[in-house]
Curated annotation (Swiss-Prot):
UniProt protein name: Cyclic pyranopterin monophosphate synthase
SUPFAM superfamilies assigned to the protein according to its UniProt record, in alphabetical order: Molybdenum cofactor biosynthesis protein C, MoaC
Pfam families the UniProt entry points to: MoaC (PF01967)
HAMAP family on file: MoaC_B
Catalytic residue list: 127
GO molecular function: cyclic pyranopterin monophosphate synthase activity
Amino acid sequence: MPLTHLNEENQPKMVDIGDKETTERIALASGRISMNKEAYDAIINHCVKKGPVLQTAIIAGIMGAKKTSELIPMCHPIMLNGVDIDILEEKETCSFKLYARVKTQAKTGVEMEALMSVSIGLLTIYDMVKAIDKSMTISGVMLEHKSGGKSGDYNAKK
């Protein structure tokens, strides 16, 4: 399968999506941040000096989705219909799992926006709590689901 982001001279190009059909596109991505108990408890108990960590991560994740095309060179700017973020508390492992669901009506998908949303949300948590735990790890950033477009639906294997 030839790479769509290279022209005949093997140089980078942005794919022309002008002839593609506008359809509803949805993408769901997820990722996790793990930390020590002190950092986890500080977040849960709202004791982080920088402010409300999880709420700030949600806002940052929304901004990440909106700014995706500015940071990923071949990503088309897309008008987003919505970005919805959920953060699950995982007390047993002192971690948080962040889910981002992005929706649009467009000629190209929103997978990159969902992945960027998760990444920026998790990085924001790291930034806000790094004074407590510099050894935090971000892992498992992945596309869980996508629908719409010519390639159809995708669901990650569980």
